Amino acid sequence: MATFKVTLINEAEGTSNTIDVPDDEYILDAAEEQGYDLPFSCRAGACSTCAGKLVSGTVDQSDQSFLDDDQIEAGYVLTCVAYPTSDVTIQTHKEEDLY
């Protein structure tokens, strides 16, 4: 099992935090376990509350059912169903940018 560095950037609050996330754990779950408060609702990849945008790195979010191909190509990610597959930087709190 690999562990990756996941950097979570909240532009609105001007914060940036880096956490260690195993490749078999969702980013949202790991962030919560390490004391970070990220937005979420369904926890199933079926809404957009937890949406973020990839700045760098790669994730596996094959469990999600909400984002369309264009949104995925634009770098949007649902943190509740995203496993890191490399070191990753994500801008959090991006739900409004989807619409």
Curated annotation (Swiss-Prot):
<dbReference type="InterPro" id="IPR006058">
    <property type="entry name" value="2Fe2S_fd_BS"/>
</dbReference>
<feature type="domain" description="2Fe-2S ferredoxin-type">
    <location>
        <begin position="4"/>
        <end position="96"/>
    </location>
</feature>
<keyword id="KW-0411">Iron-sulfur</keyword>
<dbReference type="GO" id="GO:0009055">
    <property type="term" value="F:electron transfer activity"/>
</dbReference>
<keyword id="KW-0249">Electron transport</keyword>
<protein>
    <recommendedName>
        <fullName>Ferredoxin-1</fullName>
    </recommendedName>
</protein>
<keyword id="KW-0001">2Fe-2S</keyword>
<feature type="binding site">
    <location>
        <position position="80"/>
    </location>
    <ligand>
        <name>[2Fe-2S] cluster</name>
    </ligand>
</feature>
<dbReference type="GO" id="GO:0051537">
    <property type="term" value="F:2 iron, 2 sulfur cluster binding"/>
</dbReference>
<dbReference type="Pfam" id="PF00111">
    <property type="entry name" value="Fer2"/>
</dbReference>
<keyword id="KW-0479">Metal-binding</keyword>
<feature type="binding site">
    <location>
        <position position="50"/>
    </location>
    <ligand>
        <name>[2Fe-2S] cluster</name>
    </ligand>
</feature>
<dbReference type="InterPro" id="IPR001041">
    <property type="entry name" value="2Fe-2S_ferredoxin-type"/>
</dbReference>
<dbReference type="GO" id="GO:0046872">
    <property type="term" value="F:metal ion binding"/>
</dbReference>
<dbReference type="InterPro" id="IPR012675">
    <property type="entry name" value="Beta-grasp_dom_sf"/>
</dbReference>
<feature type="binding site">
    <location>
        <position position="47"/>
    </location>
    <ligand>
        <name>[2Fe-2S] cluster</name>
    </ligand>
</feature>
<dbReference type="InterPro" id="IPR010241">
    <property type="entry name" value="Fd_pln"/>
</dbReference>
<comment type="function">
    <text>Ferredoxins are iron-sulfur proteins that transfer electrons in a wide variety of metabolic reactions.</text>
</comment>
<feature type="binding site">
    <location>
        <position position="42"/>
    </location>
    <ligand>
        <name>[2Fe-2S] cluster</name>
    </ligand>
</feature>
<comment type="similarity">
    <text>Belongs to the 2Fe2S plant-type ferredoxin family.</text>
</comment>
<dbReference type="GO" id="GO:0022900">
    <property type="term" value="P:electron transport chain"/>
</dbReference>
<keyword id="KW-0408">Iron</keyword>
<keyword id="KW-0813">Transport</keyword>
<dbReference type="InterPro" id="IPR036010">
    <property type="entry name" value="2Fe-2S_ferredoxin-like_sf"/>
</dbReference>
<comment type="subunit">
    <text>Forms a complex with heterodimeric ferredoxin-thioredoxin reductase (FTR) and thioredoxin.</text>
</comment>
